[in-house]
Amino acid sequence: MKTVREIEFNSKTVLVRVDYNLPMDENGNIADDNRIRATLPLVNYLVDKGAKIVLASHMGRPKGKPAASLSLAPAAKRLSELLGFEVVFVDDCIGPKVKERVDQLEPGQIILLENLRFYKGEEENDPEFARSLAELCQVYVNDAFAVSHRTAASIVAITRFVREACAGFLLEKEVKCFHDSIENPVHPLVAIIGGAKVSSKLGALENMLNHVDALVIGGAMANTFLKSQGNDVGASMVEEDLVETAAHIVQEARDRKINLILPVDLVVADRFDADAQTRVVDVKAVPQGWMALDIGPETGAIFARAIQRAATIVWNGPMGVFEMKPFCNGTKMVAAAVAAADAFSVVGGGDTGLAVNLCGVADKMSYVSTGGGAFLHLMEGKKLPGVTALD
């Protein structure tokens, strides 16, 4: 995979695929600008090298039609503020008017194009849409790890039509961190997998058995595993069609002498509500009609001990419904343990990234990934289409 350090950029027009798919508040303001900040090292590097910079991104799911609420104009404004000079926003992403504006760029100047997904061709990996984007540049840079698991025109097809294509700093760093944490880790390697559904993490669970020394399972998905071991989990969320699969994973871990750790106690509630009645119970004593919404304190302590023994930690998925105060302690205990561990720690994006930020320990992790789906894709042992396209 070629990187930006291997390319001469002076006076060349560069199209950089970034991920500015930003969370917005109810007033249309950016709620979190971390994804913009993550691209600043690359943007500043290209400015210093005298490139003419065209930034391209999607935002949300407009389904091939323009939607004012999903415009990237606020991203251009915020990037201008962070850089200290104007980033020009163009209200389209392909066509003669866009090409004309790009041709007017001077070295060190930046344009941000409008939302790529305002055209159906982006998500369809349409070669004609990709060709139209490629006509805007001499060099293509992919710095959008978080969408590199998608076969999109600006991620995959575009590489067939540009003279030079390479990875940006963020994509390069993400791929390297993944390699160092899973494909070539310092052992013991402990994977912590949580979240709601076994079905969404099944590929990751099965692939992790090929790499880990210990596998810690929390979140609502643990209910399916607990049921597979003969526990009655009351009204807790269980994927009945995957109970047998969960039992197979537990047995597979035993056969491979992998320490698979399940909860021993749970925080249960009489309903799914922040104001619900709650109790801490043993996994064998969940009351009928009650549901598990977090791991219990004894489980948190057991998980923490396993984490402390690790030399490498990979964490994807919260331990409970951490957005509700009564059910956030399990995630907090795990976050604190990972932060305190003398280990190389990589945290998957999405909810887990949000959780470590809320717990105030993001800066104690070795790396917090910018990608949820892309990170999971790698955990499943799959190649990223966006990375393969650069080879």
UniProtKB/Swiss-Prot annotation:
Keyword Transferase (UniProt): yes
> Taking the first listed entry, what is the main subcellular location of this protein, grouped into a coarse class?
cytoplasm
As recorded in UniProt, its EC number(s) are 2.7.2.3
Pathway entry: Carbohydrate degradation; glycolysis; pyruvate from D-glyceraldehyde 3-phosphate: step 2/5
UniProt keyword list: ATP-binding, Cytoplasm, Glycolysis, Kinase, Nucleotide-binding, Transferase
Provide the GO biological process annotations. gluconeogenesis; glycolytic process
What does the entry list as the binding residues for ATP?
A: K201, E323, G349, G350, D351, T352
Highest taxon in the source lineage: Bacteria
* Enzymatic reactions: (2R)-3-phosphoglycerate + ATP = (2R)-3-phospho-glyceroyl phosphate + ADP
For this protein, the record's SUPFAM superfamilies field holds: Phosphoglycerate kinase
Q: List the Pfam families.
A: PGK
| Residues binding substrate | D19, Y20, N21, R35, H58, M59, G60, R61, R117, R150
Q: Which GO terms describe its molecular function?
A: ADP binding; ATP binding; phosphoglycerate kinase activity
Task: Give an example GO cellular component term for this record.
Answer: cytosol
Q: Where in the cell is it found?
A: Cytoplasm
Query: Which proteins does it associate with, and in what oligomeric form?
Result: Monomer.
Annotated family? Belongs to the phosphoglycerate kinase family.
Question: Could you identify this protein by its name?
Answer: Phosphoglycerate kinase
